[in-house]
């Protein structure tokens, strides 16, 4: 702490926005793997990987698609997705174009619709399959419940066969339409400053109706930077991020901090830590991907403590991090 305090914050942290983070990471790490998606929890299964350069291209394309749909810096983009690569396009492309609003799919339609209406969500990015939580049918119902919505973007499942996508009615597009937009710059020409609002995150709703908390770009950038400094995160690190991305733990320390530092971040199936097979195979996944740190909430750590190593080599792990409300 004393070492960090010897430099003014503006000098130590010149980055203004989450968008700047991804521009810098793509320049620094290029073809290095940024995100690894595991279609199943089987350690032998072939993963899907995106490099830092590919991730920035996708962020540009997504932001430009949203801009084309009328999203501006004051407009909210709601997100209803499981664990998937495209969640990162929705998050960071949404923040580059407007204000992202990640949503917990386990909340009732009424609670989600109320939050979207409060945020005046203009676009909803939703998973185009039922999955285990009825994503697509919920998205269709929300479309009728939220008066401010002008468009719904469908995210196809990773294993959807060519030509199997359903016909979409007016006002609905496949997120793959992003490929029709430039991937090397923001068409809007937006210059994001630290005080701009980046996201609306909702509280858990355990003490009544969920409430919206505003995140500025500067606050998210500082949180990511602080995590990197405190934990000594470095480009050779590899971590499994099994948190849901409607939760700040999954988005800020679990994703933004790692992706600002050149880390390979693993997305363990669409079910994340809710997938029992991910927990059962966790130590074998650590061995397969040579993970260097373990990150989970206490309930997940308790579950992992009951999973035998089964001969898995986990010697690459350097530390464990956790956190919880008390």
Annotate each language-model stretch with its function.
Residues 13-15, 30-33, 154, 159, ...:
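Conserved pre-ATP/AMP-binding loop-to-beta segment of ANL
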Residues 14, 31-84, 88-91, 108-113, ...:
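Conserved AMP-binding/adenylate-forming core of the ANL superfamily
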Residues 56-62, 180-185, 194, 198, ...:
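Conserved structural elements of the adenylate-forming
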Residues 63, 82-101, 105-109, 117-123, ...:
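A short helix-loop-beta submotif of the ANL/AMP-binding
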Residues 95, 221-238, 246-292, 301, ...:
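Conserved AMP-binding/adenylation subdomain of ANL enzymes
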Residues 99-175:
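Structural core segment of the AMP-binding/adenylate-forming
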Residues 126-138, 270-272, 289-326:
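Adenylate-forming
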């Amino acid at each position: 702490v004393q070492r960090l305090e010897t430099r003014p914050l503006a000098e130590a942290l010149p980055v203004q926005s989450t968008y700047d983070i991804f521009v810098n990471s793509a320049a620094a790490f290029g073809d290095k793997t940024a995100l690894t998606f595991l279609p199943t929890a089987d350690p032998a299964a072939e993963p899907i990987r995106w490099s830092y350069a590919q991730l920035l291209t996708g962020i540009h394309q997504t932001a430009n698609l949203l801009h084309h749909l009328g999203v501006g810096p004051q407009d909210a983009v709601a997100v209803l997705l499981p664990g998937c690569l495209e969640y990162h396009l929705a998050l960071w492309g949404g923040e580059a174009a407007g204000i992202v609003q990640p949503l917990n799919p386990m909340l009732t339609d009424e609670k989600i619709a109320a939050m979207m209406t409060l945020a005046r969500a203009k676009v909803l990015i939703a998973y185009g399959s039922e999955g285990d939580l009825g994503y697509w049918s919920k998205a269709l119902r929300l479309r009728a419940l939220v008066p401010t919505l002008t468009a719904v973007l469908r995210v196809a499942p990773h294993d959807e066969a060519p030509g199997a996508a359903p016909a979409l009615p007016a006002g609905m597009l496949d997120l793959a339409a992003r490929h029709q937009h430039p991937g090397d710059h923001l068409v809007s020409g937006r210059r994001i400053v630290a005080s701009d609002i980046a996201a609306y995150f909702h509280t858990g709703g355990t003490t009544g109706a969920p409430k919206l908390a505003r995140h500025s770009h500067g606050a998210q950038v500082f949180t990511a930077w602080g995590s990197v400094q405190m934990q000594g995160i470095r480009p050779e690190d590899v971590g499994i991020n099994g948190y849901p991305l409607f939760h700040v733990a999954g988005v800020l320390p679990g994703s933004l901090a790692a992706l600002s530092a050149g880390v390979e971040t693993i997305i363990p199936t669409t079910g994340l830590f809710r997938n029992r097979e991910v927990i059962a195979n966790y130590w074998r996944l650590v061995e397969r991907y040579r993970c260097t740190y373990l990150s989970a909430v206490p309930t997940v750590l308790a579950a992992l403590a009951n999973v035998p190593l089964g001969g898995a080599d986990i010697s690459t792990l350097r530390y464990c991090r956790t956190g919880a409300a008390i």
